[in-house]
Amino acid sequence: MVRSFFTQRLLPAGYLFLLLFLGTSPWKTVAAQDDLLSLLDAEQAKEPSYTIATFKASRLINGQTIETISKNHLNFWISHRFGAVNSGFIANFFGLDEAKIRLGLEYGLTDRWLVGAGRSSLEKTYDLYTKYKVLRQSNTVPITVTAMAGWGINTMPTGYIMESGSPMKFNNNIERYSYWSQLLVARKFNEKLSLQLMPTLIHVNKVEDPSIPNQLFSLGAGGRYKLSQRITLSAEYYYTLRELEDEDDDDDYDANGGIPYPYRNALSFGVDIETGGHVFQFHLTNARGMVEKQFIGQNVGSWGKGDIFYGFNIARTFSLDKAARNSHK
């Protein structure tokens, strides 16, 4: 009885006296706890929640996306562009006999910074580039911004015939160089739709005719729409800010006459299929080049004339992170 009286009567009374002595009350204590929880919720709301998988790969179709790759991971790219479908069935089997290929590697120095290199059979071009994710979309930042810079060298013998039909003669190796830089700006609107802008500056040390500028600016736009968990539709378009020849003008290019070659804006459509560590990209495009200098600055294909090239990209990701591999054992 004494113990029951002590626990049921004296302890609660003592607790109430202590609260009154401290100048508070049980109700104030509960209110203080609620205020503390509210402050914690507010602090958590301020912490950024980053958007992931704006795009499934570091390339959209021909061009780059804002995506980088994880630290100590390696991407291996295989890209094919076949000949134009208007090249005929008997002569080239609708372009299958005129395939161009690019092999490329990308390595993640950090989760936001990668370096890449590749070799394209078109003009036997070697390219190097780097990308850095400057801003990441989150609950406080509406967009992702990635900066990219690249360099390429044309290793064809001097005097070769370009895609434009004109000869290209190099006086030294410096004339073989080209450079490009991009600011990739994208937003993931929801789980299905992502859009991207790609302002691009390209400089080519040697062009085939004085009427063609060494430097050009292009504004690209692209996006993707997810049909399912693994299948995505994609598109991209690069508008080059310089005078283009009329699509209906069939005059041949005359390098010596100063007539600017009818370089075209690149327009591409694709379907992406993701299967585990692989990404398969199938597309139709009027650009056969796979380096920025080629598919933006020197694109000769015209959708209106049937210069449509079909091709594909295959990307395979490998983890070189020993700690991550050991954690899965």
Residue ranges, per PLM feature:
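A contiguous binding-surface segment within folded domains or other stable secondary-structure elements
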Residues: 209-247
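N-terminal secretory signal peptides that target proteins for export/translocation
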Residues: 1-9
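Intrinsically disordered, low-complexity segments enriched in Ser/Pro/Gly/Ala and basic residues
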Residues: 3-4, 24, 185
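Sec/Tat signal peptide C-region and signal peptidase I cleavage site
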Residues: 26-32
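Transmembrane beta-barrel domains of Gram-negative outer membranes and organellar outer membranes
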Residues: 33-171, 176-181, 187-197, 201-205, ...
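Bacterial N-terminal signal peptides
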Residues: 13-25
